[in-house]
């Protein structure tokens, strides 16, 4: 079998067409003479020059053009030049359109943009883990948003939930024994979200926590004095930072996260108007 010269044509990067072509050639034990990519071909005036080059080199065309007008022009021109052409997307798009009764978006590069969104989420999740519970105060400067709150205000699960939305979140516990990170005062207060909870609810949660680990009534963790002290420290800090404060009492993680996302959306809209 003669080694083929393969020309990949795409209105995006051409990675999909090249990957499929290499996979197909491997079934014949062939290494292509070369695979040349013509990427971001999004207008018909480029087509004749490309097809002429392929014809001169006795090559074949494999393409993943999603723009219908460009795809039809490429297929027609290749036939006119007698160039073998494989349309990877056209038949599939047509069949899916017929099956689902909807028109394709015809937007090149959507897989790539979806991949980028996926990897952004992965990076955000890793960031949330690395910056959980105040373990890396310097992360505050790289975060999209910072959650602050006393113990049992759902900071960690909220950080993970918001990370799934692609947001880089740091959460900082507010406890009397720990120094408040200086970095909190170096960022825009709009990036800080305080999480507060009622004394009654917090007392109940902490008492149940102690029971679950076999230490009912132990220490000061669930004492009135301790809880009053922590709530006072939080209120003072939130006031000093002039940050947005959200009451999480009796709210599910999803509900609180949704309120945070709504608040974030309002910040974005406000900044766009400035």
From Swiss-Prot:
Its EC number is 2.7.11.32, 2.7.4.27. ADP binds at residues 149-156. It catalyses: N(tele)-phospho-L-histidyl/L-threonyl-[pyruvate, phosphate dikinase] + ADP = N(tele)-phospho-L-histidyl/O-phospho-L-threonyl-[pyruvate, phosphate dikinase] + AMP + H(+); N(tele)-phospho-L-histidyl/O-phospho-L-threonyl-[pyruvate, phosphate dikinase] + phosphate + H(+) = N(tele)-phospho-L-histidyl/L-threonyl-[pyruvate, phosphate dikinase] + diphosphate. Coiled coil: none annotated. GO terms for molecular function: ADP binding; ATP binding; phosphotransferase activity, phosphate group as acceptor; protein serine/threonine kinase activity. Keywords: Kinase, Nucleotide-binding, Serine/threonine-protein kinase, Transferase. Pfam families: Kinase-PPPase. NCBIfam families: PRK05339.1. HAMAP family: PDRP. Bifunctional serine/threonine kinase and phosphorylase involved in the regulation of the pyruvate, phosphate dikinase (PPDK) by catalyzing its phosphorylation/dephosphorylation. Belongs to the pyruvate, phosphate/water dikinase regulatory protein family. PDRP subfamily. This is Putative pyruvate, phosphate dikinase regulatory protein 1. It comes from Listeria welshimeri serovar 6b (strain ATCC 35897 / DSM 20650 / CCUG 15529 / CIP 8149 / NCTC 11857 / SLCC 5334 / V8).
